[in-house]
Amino acid sequence: MTNKLLDALAQAETVAITGHVNPDGDCVGSCMGMYLYLKENYPGIRADVYLKDVRESFSYIEDLDKARERFELGDKYDLLLLFDVSSRDRICVSQEILHSCARSVCVDHHVTNPGLGEENVIVPEASSTCEVLFGLLEEEKISKAAAEALYTGIAHDTGMFHHSCTSGKTMRIAGTLMEKGIDFTRIADVSFYTKTYRQNQIMGRTILESIMLLDGKCIVGVVSQRVMEFYGVTPKDLDGIVDQLRVTRGVEVAIFLYAVGTQEYKVSMRSNGGVDVSAVAQSFGGGGHVRAAGCTM
């Protein structure tokens, strides 16, 4: 069976790796998992990771401090690896990176991904991009450090193995990564459950000021630029709010909007199963999954 990722790597000497804006655990985990795998198994390849606005809670991932936040025009690579990116406008750091690489491979699990790379490995039924990536790598060559990154992505996109996207295959892969000796308890505590006081404050305020619509079937929370400035937070501090809104009894859809610019809002949507929020997001130029999607308005 053809492995598009490994086939492309066999012909590359320089590789750029990137994910999506406001990178979550799956994005960070897949990008860094790939970087660490290359570092450990492809000494002849020079690889650079491009990620911006990464949450401090992921700092335990090895070499994350080497990620670049800016793409310099003029930089050239043999291969671009795109992870967890469903559309061109969601590419982290700069879209110019698309034009600076001779080839590109996109690895993703978003059903709305049109095929962003020249070669694509898109598996919508997978729990996460990290699950897809695991299937493309040689298991025995995955180190403990790379396993930590991959486990992080799977754990986050499954909501610590709670969401319906979790399958038996997902659990078997997670078990394999655990057997590499990773501290899975620490990963959960540090990157998923632990919140700063300010994060708890703004989550509490958002829930307090949220409104119920459609006879309680839809809940909406909003964070304005003014409120973000008041609490001294940035978009990366808002992780988890939409999921907390979703678990409200009787709610079928949760919508969370937060300011990202003047008269511009990022919209995150979650469904408890009866509504395909990816279809809603697509109508506004966004995308995602049936139960988790987003767009910018």
Residue locations for each model-derived region?
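Hydrophobic helix-and-loop "lid/oligomerization" segment in the mid-to-C-terminal part
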Residues: 3-19, 29-59, 69, 73-79, ...
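Short glycine-rich anion-binding loops that position phosphate/pyrophosphate groups of nucleotides
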Residues: 21-23, 85-88, 110-112, 225-226, ...
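Active-site cofactor/cluster-binding pocket
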Residues: 62-64, 68-119
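A glycine- and small-aliphatic-rich helix-loop capping segment at beta-alpha/alpha-beta transitions
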Residues: 40, 97-104, 138-139, 168
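Solvent-exposed alpha-helices and their adjacent loops that cap or buttress functional pockets
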Residues: 72-75, 96-99, 113-114, 142-144, ...
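Short alpha-helices
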Residues: 109-173
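Short glycine/serine/threonine-rich phosphate/pyrophosphate-binding segments
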Residues: 25-31, 88-92
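Generic enzyme active-site microenvironment
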Residues: 18, 22, 82, 106-107, ...
